[in-house]
A protein has these predicted regions:
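Surface-exposed, low-hydrophobicity beta-strand/loop segments enriched in small/polar/acidic residues
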Residues: 1-123
Length: 123
């Protein structure tokens, strides 16, 4: 299935607090200790700002998709249509609707396990 990107995505630039060169397509959040900076989500209770689209080193510009359709890294198997949350490594996992942790988007493709890249709608 092809997905058309019509320019409706919301993409921002922040500063990578740490080396995020190995974190492309993982979920990032605001670094509360540093203005205009991001870190990889590190807990299932974190509220993601968006998906890291590039591979910045520490102090470099981090391109973050806050809303739209994008690739994301999985932390476990994910079914097409599943609601998505974050795991303790910044990757997406299936999030049950009744769960108190934040729902971040919906899977548009399927993952067989951790470490795969899928397409998701992020909101």
């Amino acid at each position: 299935m092809a997905y058309q990107y019509d320019g409706s995505a919301i993409v921002i630039t922040q500063t990578a607090t740490a080396d995020l060169s190995a974190s492309q397509y993982e979920l990032v959040m605001c670094d509360t200790a540093n203005d205009s900076s991001v870190v990889v989500c590190a807990a299932v209770t974190d509220t993601p700002l968006g998906v890291l689209l590039n591979k910045p080193g520490a102090g470099e510009a981090a391109t973050v998709l806050c809303a739209g359709v994008t690739k994301v890294a999985t932390g476990a198997a994910v079914a097409n249509g599943a609601l998505l949350g974050v795991d303790a490594t910044g990757r997406v996992v299936t999030q049950a609707p009744a769960n108190v942790n934040p729902v971040f988007g919906q899977a548009l493709t399927t993952s067989g396990g951790a470490g795969e890249i899928i397409t998701a709608a992020i909101n």
